[in-house]
Amino acid sequence: MAKLERKDRKFKFETLQLHVGQEQPDPVTDARAVPIYQTSSYVFRNSQHAADRFGLKDAGNIYGRLTNPTEDVFEKRIAALEGGTAALAVASGAAAITYTIENLAQQGDHIVSAKNIYGGSFNLLEHTLPNYGITTTFVDIFNLEEVENAIQENTKAVYIETLGNPNSDVVDIEAIANIAHKHKIPLVVDNTFATPYLVRPIEYGADVVVHSATKFIGGHGTTIGGVIIEGGKFDWEASGKFPSLTDPNPSYHGISFTKACGPAAFVTKIRAILLRDTGATISPISSFIFLQGLETLSLRVERHVENALKVVEYLNNHPQVERVHHPSVDPDPKQQELYKKYFPNGGGSIFTFEIKGDSKKAQEFIDNLELFSLLANVADVKSLVIHPATTTHSQCTEEELLDQGIKPNTIRLSIGTENIDDIIQDLDEAFKAIQ
């Protein structure tokens, strides 16, 4: 009973989100729920066993900073849901993005990134990484010629988000992947806003997928975490641009990660070196909470999307709204085409609209909402609101804000799973209060 042993059977997403990584009850206790292994370290059977673990000859646990059995289940499950070969959970989404870039680029290297990304990611690429000799060219990701022209000899990756932040623009993952692969570099995709339930970027050519697990994966605004998923198809050796992955690594017994770890080389190197040395480790309890979140991911996302599309329709017809930025109502035919291709079941419960008026009017509207929580998070089951220009993207210059589609009167909504009538009533009363 309760054993997923048939290798000839391919399970669907809703089943995988419940079972992968714990195909049978805990072998020691028979517990059906994944146990929380709250431990810092692990006992080795003997000296040779310890040496084999440290030499990566035995894949078991070494130390809590690197691995944990609860974390392992979470990693296997999210890898399966994204269609990847391996995953690494870390302490935050920011850590996941930082480790991914640092695993690809070193001093003197270059990244090509979309302009329309999360403000924290923009600051990392624009201000922090240049201190370590890694530069970034930001491009209009919808102009494929501009993307390709930005790639240099020292470019190590193209970085995008499935849905741009904060306006939920749909990016053509497949087209960008083709450009990246033409130049023998990987495509990195932040899939936080879409989730693998709506879009699996690896199926469209992405090589590495990152998430802020804090958002839809956790789903309840309780826990900080991030995850990196490896697609397993990029040929690091044929590329010739990533010696730290392909050549003997002096920091780890002269190991070649591609030869030793195959399709898990990318995340294994992060775990063995970057995580070992800098320690942005996820806690066992956080991993457990994210597993709880994954078990209801499809159910929650369905409701998020259902509610969001009704709110988009309401706002799109409201006299006090200048424009709604959501792919379902985007006037650009190309966005409509991409939305149908990548989101056949709908999507985008995090989006923006421009209220008629200025920054003060936008903030006045926000302050009159009661059901919506004003906070710096998204993808909670509770509906959320924020004024990007003065909060999440406040470090950007006016020019950078406009480049990212953010105006003084832009308001970002994250639509929750409350009753849709209550959500719309709250918006309606806030509009009436500022007339």
Language-model features and meaning:
Residues M1-D58:
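N-terminal glycine-rich, Lys/His-bearing helix-loop that initiates the first secondary-structure elements
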Residues M1-K3, E126-H127, T135, E153, ...:
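PLP-dependent enzyme catalytic core of the Aspartate aminotransferase-like
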Residues L4-R9, G21-P25, A86-H318:
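Conserved PLP-enzyme active-site core in the AAT-like
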Residues V158, G226-I228, V324, F351, ...:
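Well-ordered beta-strand positions enriched in small/hydrophobic/aromatic, beta-favoring residues
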Residues L163, T192-A194, V329, K356, ...:
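Active-site beta-loop-alpha junctions enriched in small/polar residues
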Residues I229, T352-E354, S414-G416:
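Short hydrophobic/aromatic beta-strand micro-patches
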Residues T278-T281, I285-S287, Q292, T296, ...:
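Conserved small-domain helix->loop->beta segment predominantly found in fold-type I
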